[in-house]
A protein has these predicted regions:
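Metal-associated gating/positioning segment near the N- to mid-region
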Residues: 2-64, 86
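Anion (oxyanion) recognition and catalysis
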Residues: 42, 67, 149
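Short, electropositive alpha-helical surface patch
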Residues: 59-74, 132-138, 142
Length: 160
């Protein structure tokens, strides 16, 4: 039997309009939108979804109902980014390593399957493909990865 998977989803997005998607979930998770997304995945034979997390608790809810659709859904619940850098739309910010460790614990407490760290910004095509915001240092990435591993979690990295 073939298995089709989506390996970098954001269940809170709708694939059309970022602002509309955020507004839909801003004050509460839209159960209907999540159920429609899972029904569409199932219709297309997608049985595995790895989400990249969000700041609105949508993937947290989605992780609870995915089995109803026969979907193996994995999520960090939210991504973790350095304060003042890219990542606010998908997660929580940290300033020091202790604060980062607290967020790792929160992911684990929420039932997250892995840690997602934002190591860079995004491509800015208005400036010929430069990457927004300063990337994390090699030492920061190593320390963050070690802290996640110490908590028994693997790491997914956002990199551009």
């Amino acid at each position: 039997m073939k298995m089709f998977g989506e390996c970098h989803a954001h269940i809170f997005l709708n694939g059309r309009n970022y602002k509309e998607a955020v507004a839909l979930h801003k004050n509460h998770v839209s159960e209907e939108a999540i159920r429609q997304a899972f029904a569409e995945y199932r219709k297309r034979g997608i049985t595995f979804v790895r989400d990249g997390g969000d700041a609105l608790h949508v993937s947290e809810y989605a992780s609870k109902i995915a089995p109803q659709y026969g979907i193996d859904y994995r999520s960090p619940m939210f991504a973790i980014h350095r304060k003042g850098h890219y990542g606010r739309i998908v997660g929580c910010a940290w300033e020091g390593l202790e604060e980062y460790r607290d967020l790792v614990k929160k992911v684990k407490d929420l039932g997250g399957d892995f840690i997602k760290i934002m190591t860079t910004g995004i491509l800015d095509f208005a400036t010929k493909g430069h990457v927004t915001s300063e990337p994390l240092s090699r030492e920061e990435v190593f320390a963050m990865t070690a802290a996640a591993h110490d908590a028994g979690l693997s790491v997914m990295a956002h990199v551009n």
